[in-house]
Amino acid sequence: MNRACRTGLPLVLAWLLALAAPAWATQPPPSQWTADIAAFQARDHEQAPPQHGVLFIGSSSIRFWTSLAQDFPGVPVINRGFGGSAIADSTFYVDRIVTPYHPKVIVMYAGDNDIAEGASAGQVIKDFQAFVARVRKDLPTVDIVYLSIKPSLARQALWPAMREANAGIAQWMRGKPNLRFVDDTQAMLDAQGHPRAELLREDGLHMKPAGYAIWTAALRPVLAEYGFATH
């Protein structure tokens, strides 16, 4: 083997390995969330969260769901939403804010910020698939529920892409074991197909309690199927 081949071979092998690696393994560390994740871990150290419960994870719409325990009485819930995050951020931190809790069910809301930051619907679908693959590596039988990307006034111009992402994720999840797509879109739109302003805060993006009431109503029967009936 000549010298050029010998020196080029490691580069080729590295390139092939990079292609073979799952998407979640090649993402750079999302350092902007270091403080949030450290705060979660400090809280876990002070008081261990319930095992085998229902883990809510995703962006600020999860983070601001401060009434989780009241909305699902008797259900061991954990809130690990961190504001502004995209799907890939949750994927990167699975080993720190998912796996340690051994949840029976994971409820994810994310994808909204992804599209707002320029991701295509196709990329959102791929990122969610990568999240599922990463979770399955540690928790092969956990049930994963995806809450559809919600319509909002602030991001109304992006709604076609969000709707496309919803449809693609729903289609991909359909018929697969331990996966469930929960679509509450219609309840959040008015008769003209516009986002219902009364469900949203002044920023036109985040939800008021009335919006969370819609999510709660949509999720209660789903969680009951998984053995988490509310009291």
Where are these regions (language model features)?
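N-terminal secretory targeting modules
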Residues: 1-56, 62, 66, 70-71, ...
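Catalytic His-Asp segment of secreted/periplasmic serine-dependent ester chemistry enzymes
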Residues: 17, 153-231
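Short amphipathic alpha-helices and their capping/turn segments at secondary-structure boundaries
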Residues: 42-54, 93-99, 133-136
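Conserved beta-strand scaffold positions in the cores of enzyme catalytic domains, especially
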Residues: 56, 77-79, 181
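Oxyanion-hole/transition-state-stabilizing segment in secreted/luminal serine hydrolases
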Residues: 62-78, 87-125, 145, 149-153
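N-terminal cationic-hydrophobic initiation segments that often serve targeting/anchoring roles
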Residues: 69, 98, 132, 136, ...
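Charged helix-capping and loop-helix junction motifs
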Residues: 121-131, 161-166
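A short helix->loop->beta-strand "cap" motif at the edges of active sites that frequently abuts
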Residues: 139-143
